[in-house]
């Protein structure tokens, strides 16, 4: 086995590194998927625990993550430029359906993505209003905000950001861009512009949270279809896993965690059978597909102190029956 240190990642502090990888209950000759390669922290640690017969397939839709993955020269490793919802197609292509010993997902935006102003993810840094994980596909946030209605934007802000002032913020954004058309001025095109506009639209300020936090989250989730991607993966993951294969998923906000928690709970219960029927235990447990492993895990105080961005992370693990 290789040492973990030989695979150190310099740019990004990986959240719940040991907990998430330990959740996979690695077999040294196993086949694993890291569905969110990012800057490779989890992948490098997994590789350090595998024998020469082990295998790791990593997936990411961010071109910069793919470039980082190409730095790993290891015959046990391969990278796929795709979103994790396409893991079933990748497994089919590689003849690995039902043979995967574990799938790991880290649903957070990586620190480099947040810190690179030109990606447009952060209201703390001025940059183009992009927000796409894969900058080669789909509409940017700027392009979408030019054409969205107040009603649709309000829905996005409420649904994906749980923003209490969604209607007020949506109206301010749409009115700004309508005014730009009318007066021949510039559309919203910078993260700093959007953050300032949101700040002006919100009547009450939370001193512990920037007024634009929820709106930026909501727009990013919508632009990247993040919850649709997660739902698609969850619906297909069981077919990819071998018996006793594990799902280890880190989420960073309540919408994602709710989906993961509900999925694991539902798949661990088996058939819904009316109470009181004289059935054997094996009949009651028929169709039970997952076993939940332990309780949800959150970062320690020490990890949060070392990496404040980890504070909202929640890890859930389940095993294929």
UniProtKB/Swiss-Prot annotation:
Annotated EC: 2.1.1.199
Gene3D superfamilies xrefs: Putative methyltransferase TM0872, insert domain (1.10.150.170), Vaccinia Virus protein VP39 (3.40.50.150)
An example Gene Ontology biological process: rRNA base methylation
Gene Ontology, cellular component aspect: cytoplasm
Catalytic activity: cytidine(1402) in 16S rRNA + S-adenosyl-L-methionine = N(4)-methylcytidine(1402) in 16S rRNA + S-adenosyl-L-homocysteine + H(+)
UniProt cross-references to Pfam families, sorted A to Z: Methyltransf_5 (PF01795)
Residues reported to bind S-adenosyl-L-methionine: 40-42, 60, 84, 106, 113
Cross-referenced InterPro entries: RsmH, SAM-dep_MeTrfase_MraW_recog, SAM-dependent_MTases_sf
Compartmental location: Cytoplasm
Claim: Electron transport is one of the keywords in the record: no
Keywords from the UniProt entry: Cytoplasm, Methyltransferase, rRNA processing, S-adenosyl-L-methionine, Transferase
Uppermost EC category: transferase
Principal location listed in the UniProt entry: cytoplasm
UniProt function note: Specifically methylates the N4 position of cytidine in position 1402 (C1402) of 16S rRNA.
Family membership noted in the UniProt record: Belongs to the methyltransferase superfamily. RsmH family.
Descriptive protein name: Ribosomal RNA small subunit methyltransferase H
Origin species: Haemophilus influenzae (strain ATCC 51907 / DSM 11121 / KW20 / Rd)
Gene this protein is translated from: rsmH
